[in-house]
C-alpha cells in the first residue's frame, strides 16, 4: 500500500477550464486536492461545473503544480500515466466519497 498524505483539501469553489483536442472549453469545479509522499506530487480531482448536484458525473484527475499561494486553478495540470499511480488516486477518491456519504 502506498503512503499518501491523507491531508485532503476541499477547495472553496475553485474553477478550472479544460480544453479538449478539438479546442472545446469546459468549466470544471475542483472537488479536492491532495499530496502523495510516495510520488512526490500533488493531485487535483475535478468534476464538470455544469452538472446537477444529484447527477452522476465523470471525475477527472490530474497531477498538478500550484502557484505560490497553493492555488490548483492557477498551476499546470499533468496527466497521470502510471497504473499504480492511478490506483492510488482511485483509492483516495473512493475514501473521500465513502467519508462524504457518511456525513
Swiss-Prot record:
Annotated signal sequence is none
| Top-level taxon | Bacteria
InterPro entries in the record? UPF0473
Family the entry assigns: Belongs to the UPF0473 family.
Quote the PANTHER family the UniProt record gives. UPF0473 PROTEIN CBO2561/CLC_2432, UPF0473 PROTEIN CBO2561_CLC_2432
Q: What is this protein called?
A: UPF0473 protein LCA_0390
